[in-house]
C-alpha cells in the first residue's frame, strides 16, 4: 500500500513525523507537506506562482504551498506511482465542529478524496498540544491511526472523508462515531499598537462548543462531546454542502 501523508503544520512538525513512523509498517509512506506552517488555509490552491517541491529526505518532500497543493502535486505527476490512501495530520490542535471550514488538515484530506482515494484527517485535541515539540507526544494518537487503518477503513460514499479528533489524555476510553458539532460565535478580535505606532489585529480565537443536539434517530453525540469525555471522535464529512431538505421548498417559493 502506498500512503501519502500531508498536513498544515509543516513538514518538520512532530505530528507528521510520528504519523509517518507509525504507518511505515503498512507500506510505502511518502510525506509531502508545506515547508512552513499553513494552518487555516482550508482547501486553497496556489494559482498565482509556481510551486517548488524539494526532497529533503527519502520519501519526504517540502513544498512552498498549501496543504491542498501538496496533495494535488503528489497525485498529479510528482510521482510515477499512485497512492492508495491519503492521511492528513496529525494536526497540532483540534478540528471540531465549524473548525473544518478553515482547516488545512481537512482541506488536504478533501483534496485526496477529490482524486478518488480514501482520505482521513487526524487531529490531536487538548489544551497543551500547541506546546508539543517532540514526536513522542503524538505516539498514542499515531498508534490509534495505525490500528484504525489496519482494521480496514469503513467504506464511505464518494466525496466523503473521515474527520478524526483524538483527545490528548493518558488513556483513551474508546471510539465514538459522531456528528459535526458547532461553536458559538468566535471570540472578538484583539487589537494593539505595534512598536511603530500602527494598529494591528489578531483573529483566530475559537468560540466554545454549542450544545445543539442534531435530530438523529440514535444516541450519536457531537465530536465535541466525544473528545471532552475522552473518546476518539470519528465523523464522516462531505464536500457537498447543499441543503437538500429545503431544495424543493425553495424552488417552489422562487419558481
Swiss-Prot record:
Coiled-coil stretches: none
Substrates-to-products reaction catalysed: a ribonucleoside 5'-phosphate + H2O = a ribonucleoside + phosphate
Cofactor binding annotation: Binds 1 divalent metal cation per subunit.
Keywords of this entry: Cytoplasm, Hydrolase, Metal-binding, Nucleotide-binding
Keyword Nucleotide-binding: yes
Gene Ontology cellular-component annotations: cytoplasm
InterPro entries recorded: SurE, SurE-like_Pase/nucleotidase, SurE-like_sf
EC number, UniProt record: 3.1.3.5
GO molecular function: 3'-nucleotidase activity; 5'-nucleotidase activity; exopolyphosphatase activity; metal ion binding; nucleotide binding
UniProt similarity note: Belongs to the SurE nucleotidase family.
Protein name: 5'-nucleotidase SurE
Lineage: Bacteria, Pseudomonadati, Pseudomonadota, Gammaproteobacteria, Moraxellales
Amino acid at each position: 500500500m502506498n500512503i501519502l501523508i500531508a498536513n498544515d503544520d509543516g513538514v518538520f512538525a512532530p505530528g507528521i513525523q510520528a504519523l509517518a513512523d507509525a504507518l511505515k509498517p503498512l507500506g510505502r509512506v511518502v510525506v509531502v507537506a508545506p515547508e512552513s506552517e499553513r494552518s487555516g488555509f482550508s482547501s486553497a490552491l496556489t494559482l498565482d506562482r509556481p510551486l517548488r517541491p524539494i526532497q529533503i529526505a527519502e520519501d519526504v518532500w517540502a513544498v512552498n504551498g498549501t496543504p491542498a497543493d501538496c496533495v494535488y502535486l503528489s497525485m498529479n505527476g510528482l510521482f510515477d506511482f499512485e497512492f492508495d490512501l491519503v492521511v492528513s495530520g496529525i494536526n497540532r490542535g483540534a478540528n471540531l465542529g465549524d473548525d473544518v471550514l478553515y482547516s488545512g488538515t481537512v482541506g488536504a484530506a478533501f483534496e485526496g478524496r477529490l482524486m478518488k482515494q480514501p482520505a482521513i484527517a487526524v487531529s490531536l485535541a487538548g489544551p497543551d498540544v500547541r506546546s508539543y515539540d517532540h514526536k513522542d507526544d503524538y505516539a498514542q494518537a499515531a498508534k490509534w491511526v495505525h490500528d484504525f487503518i489496519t482494521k480496514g477503513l469503513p467504506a464511505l460514499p464518494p466525496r466523503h472523508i473521515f474527520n478524526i479528533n483524538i483527545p490528548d489524555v493518558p488513556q483513551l476510553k474508546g471510539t465514538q462515531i459522531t456528528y459535526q458539532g458547532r461553536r458559538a460565535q468566535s471570540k472578538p478580535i484583539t487589537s494593539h499598537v505595534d512598536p511603530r505606532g500602527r494598529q494591528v489585529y489578531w483573529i483566530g480565537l475559537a468560540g466554545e462548543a454549542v450544545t445543539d443536539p442534531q435530530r438523529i434517530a440514535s444516541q450519536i453525540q457531537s465530536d465535541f462531546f466525544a473528545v471532552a469525555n475522552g473518546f476518539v471522535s470519528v465523523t464522516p464529512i462531505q464536500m457537498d454542502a447543499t441543503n437538500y431538505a429545503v431544495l424543493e421548498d425553495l424552488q417552489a417559493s422562487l419558481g
